[in-house]
Amino acid sequence: MNAGVETLDLRPLPPVERHKKIFHKWEALQPGEVLRIINDHDPKPLYYQFEAEQKGKFECQYEQRGPVDWIVNIKRT
């Protein structure tokens, strides 16, 4: 793990387990730290969930947008 970056590869996980795993990792982050998510589809629904539950507490930035893998960095603010 890079300093301040926690990478979570969701591709091997069943879809039903993914959001639970993401929010478990998210809760452990300190302000300024980043959760780097690697996924096999665009995690846009995850963004909407963060917007509803964590509004004002995160910044989201795509590092890669498909076509096979999506990488998103979610920073705790």
Please name every model-derived segment.
Residues 2-77:
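Positively charged, polar, low-complexity stretches
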